């Protein structure tokens, strides 16, 4: 079966930055399962998978424009420390969901300067070329429900990220409307 729109595809993969740093992977015994053609992966990877078949192995370089976008200085802001009410001790690297005019935006603390905190709302892989090594492990027709919802339902789907654009940031919610992540953030796990 060819990979095309409305096909549920299982892939094993590794993704590295242009510097060769491994940022995420899904081994063949725990593949990533997604619905093709519904923007559940970074655009460049989904395009590269189109037309492939089970058993195909390939490598693809995804430019920022078809990955997580360009890095934007406008996404970096200084905010008063007191906006983090309820957090006992702030540390560089902490992740939160910031309430904005456009809705919640994931941010990471990059600097603490007295009573001010610098937060960065860019995706951690923004501005980076990504190098994927991929194998198509399985493919099947999607159910009508999966097509209607735009994502896979089942045992091997990953729902770490509502947008399905690859960042398995995890985290837990605090009562003060921020999300804080103790772990790392890869670009694959949906």
Swiss-Prot record:
GO molecular function, one term: peptidyl-prolyl cis-trans isomerase activity
Top-level taxonomic group: Bacteria
Region (PPIase first part) residue spans: 1-69
Keyword flag DNA repair: no
Stretches assigned to the PPIase FKBP-type domain: 1-95
Keywords assigned by UniProt, alphabetized: Chaperone, Cytoplasm, Isomerase, Metal-binding, Nickel, Rotamase
UniProt xrefs under InterPro entries: PPIase_dom_sf, PPIase_FKBP_dom, SlpA/SlyD-like_ins_sf
UniProt xrefs under PROSITE patterns: FKBP_PPIASE (PS50059)
Transmembrane intervals: none
EC assignment: 5.2.1.8
GO terms, biological process: protein refolding
Entry keyword annotation includes Electron transport: no
Chain segments carrying region IF-chaperone: 76-120
Subcellular location(s) per record: Cytoplasm
Major localization class: cytoplasm
Function: Folding helper with both chaperone and peptidyl-prolyl cis-trans isomerase (PPIase) activities. Chaperone activity prevents aggregation of unfolded or partially folded proteins and promotes their correct folding. PPIases catalyze the cis-trans isomerization of Xaa-Pro bonds of peptides, which accelerates slow steps of protein folding and thus shortens the lifetime of intermediates. Both strategies lower the concentration of intermediates and increase the productivity and yield of the folding reaction.
Domain-related comment: The N-terminal region consists of two globular folded domains that contain prolyl isomerase and chaperone activities.
Name of this chain's protein: FKBP-type peptidyl-prolyl cis-trans isomerase SlyD
Organism: Haemophilus influenzae (strain ATCC 51907 / DSM 11121 / KW20 / Rd)
Lineage: Bacteria, Pseudomonadati, Pseudomonadota, Gammaproteobacteria, Pasteurellales
